[in-house]
């Protein structure tokens, strides 16, 4: 059943309901297996981020940027920011230095979270021209920092650094107040367009917009806590972002595909019951099926044709 609470409180509320049940899963490329993250762990990380950002002095509706490929940490930062009524702005992981510079300055970003080496290198290269940038926080511990970099910190060190002295009553009270004050008119995200017709434009999305989208989707295509989602499109894409959040409201398991090239492998491993993708992806899947059919035996070709017809009758006719 869909949880209709405000997104700023969603993960905390779902953790009360689902506890140690897996909320997220991601592939560990060193261990070569999928690692689950429980709702309880998810909520703990979200609250840590909220308190760490508050300790840094992040203001209500201040913009925070995330420059990363899909990772569980992006969810931690998103929902941690929502918990203190800050606004998150995701950048495409392939954005150029010029694009990053423009968005950082346009949104007056003080704190930038980055994913892996390519994003860090790009972010570090624009420090001198990013007028408001104060800190870069790096998700991936394997990133090699520039020897002259005195602005960056690893994500786990950032949390430990900000919370090392404990949480004061004043900080905790401010956190509780912001959670209580969160409303549907607050800005949730700013998503920058691709910039194909000039400079990128920042599209402002409120919590109320997401809430209405969830309501409509639930009426047309209801989901449940038994569903398994596979994240494929970047979280910068509003289709994927809204779909991910929809899954979280339903209590479904989200499998985070870290590398786009691995999506077919991920599908075979996690067996998603639902996912969103652009038409080009399904065209490629369909073409692969046709090629396999042409190279198969008579019986294999017959079975594939029959399966396609069944799908067509069910979904199209």
Regions found by a protein language model. Name each.
Residues 2-25, 44:
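A short N-terminal helical cap/helix-turn-helix that marks the beginning
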Residues 1-5, 120, 147-187:
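Flexible, low-complexity linker/hinge segments
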Residues 211-228, 235-317:
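Conserved AMP-binding/adenylation subdomain of ANL enzymes
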Residues 62-63, 69-89, 93-97, 105-111, ...:
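A short helix-loop-beta submotif of the ANL/AMP-binding
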Residues 24-71, 78-79, 96-101, 154-157, ...:
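Conserved AMP-binding/adenylate-forming core of the ANL superfamily
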Residues 19-22, 138, 165-192, 199, ...:
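Conserved pre-ATP/AMP-binding loop-to-beta segment of ANL
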Residues 51, 56, 83-162:
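Structural core segment of the AMP-binding/adenylate-forming
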Residues 36-39, 188-214:
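Conserved AMP-binding A3 loop
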